[in-house]
Each structure stands twice: as C-alpha cells, then as structure tokens.
Amino acid sequence: MSEFSTVSCGGYPTVSDTFGAALWSIDYAMQMSVVGYSAAYLHTRERNVSYNLFDYLGDGVDGWITRPIYYSYFPILQGLQSYNGSRVVDLGLNDNSTAGYGIYDRETSELYRMILINFKDGNGPVDFVIPATGSPRAGGGKNATVKFLTATSIHEGSDISWSGKTWKGVLDGMPVVSGRDADLTQMDISASYTLKIPSPGLAVVMFEKPLPSGEPSGGGNSTNSPAGSNGSGNTTTTNNGSALSAGAPMIVALGAVFVGALVLN
C-alpha cells in the first residue's frame, strides 16, 4: 500500500497524536497482512504534523520528540519478522474493544506469535486465556515470552511504554526505562494460561526465541511470570462460530479459534 495513517492530509490533533492512534495503526497493519499486503508506508510529513512519527522541536530547542504512532512499529516488527515468512490470521474476537491475530510460520504452519490488543480505556486489565491445546506451536509450545505496549490512557501522547522502555521526555532518540510493564519471560504455558493485558494495551506473545531487531536500543527489563489460571464467564461467539468467554473483568478465550485458524492456512 502506498500510504496510510489516521486522518488524511496531516492527521487531526487529539486523535492522530494519541496512544489510541498507535493501537489503531497496529490493528490496521495486521488487517492488511491478513488480506495479503506485503508492505505499506505509514505516512509522515514535515514538522508539527499531528500524525508524524517524531518531530524536531526547533525554536531554540535542539532535540527530537517521539510521537505515539512511532511505537506502533515495534509490535508490528516483532510480530511479523520470521525466517520462513508469515501467514497472519484474524482470530475473529467478537468484541469492539479487543482484537487478536495469530501469526504462523509459512513453511511449518506452526503458530509462533500472537498480537493481542485491548482498546479499553483504564477499566482494569482484560484477561486473554491462552489454551494448552490448539494449533501446533513453535518451540514445542511449552514456554512463551511476552512484550507489552501500554499507556496510561487511550488519549495519552507521551507516557507510553514498549518492552519496559519509553521515549517520554527524551530528546536524543535513546529510550529509557519506563518503570512498568516489563517483559514476561519463560512463561509456562503447558497448561491453560491467563494473560492480563492492561487497559489500554497490547501484547506480543512469542512461542519461540524472538529475533533481535524487535528490541528498542538497550533492550527491555525482564521478570519471571506467575503461573496462569483458567478463566470463566458468559459465552459469546467469534466470527467463525467458535466459542469464547467474556466476563467482568473481561476474559477472552482463544482456544477454539486457533483450531479454526489453522485450517485457513
């Protein structure tokens, strides 16, 4: 695709320069991957345009600020990079505030990444239930690493964290420790696992060792994750008729969707 962004001809203040725009950009890019686009240009323009990736301050201040949409590049890169090529499947979550994508190895058809998006604004985390069974997973399906993209609000313009790092208050382009939502490493997913994604926020779930280019400079902090738990709630349906659960706090179960998604490959 030649170009895309939030609002044509430069964006719109309070829309294009928010964390919500970053999540939207990721969701849109993944939708393009689902239907077969191989590349796209996330548009940016001259200084002080609302949907820019970053801006030179000028006016006597020597430095650059990083805008929210720049953060969208990292989950997309981390999710789609592969050795053999990728096949992306929309998991069909039947909810306006969540989205999920399974990313499969084009040669082996193993599920090796997921991107899970929570668009809710500050109402507590959403629980995404990762089942013990379903499509074959890369790395044997026993462990996973999770990287988070989060912000304090869907309207936030600077206090954003990716993989435990942020560009908030940074003028030299080098990220610093954000102090929140660090990576989860070596998650035991041999049993059903409940992944809590902050509101708003996004998680990239990796079932095998990530390639190095998805890291901000300096890498992210890591912690060991607690054991997962089963979720329960009221039953709704996905777009392909598979069951998922939703409750309060909201729970999204992904098990049956994986089986259906693998057939599409």
Name what the model sees in each region.
Residues 133-199, 222:
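Acidic, Ser/Thr/Pro-rich beta/coil linker or hinge segments at domain junctions
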Residues 206-240:
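C-terminal low-complexity, Ser/Thr- and acidic/Pro-rich disordered "stalk" regions positioned immediately N-terminal
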Residues 6-101, 108-110:
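Aromatic/acidic polysaccharide-binding cleft in carbohydrate-active enzymes
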Residues 240-265:
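Cleavable C-terminal sorting propeptides in eukaryotic secreted/cell-surface proteins
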Residues 48, 84, 96, 143, ...:
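N-linked glycosylation sites
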Residues 93-139, 146-153, 200-203:
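Carbohydrate-binding surface patches
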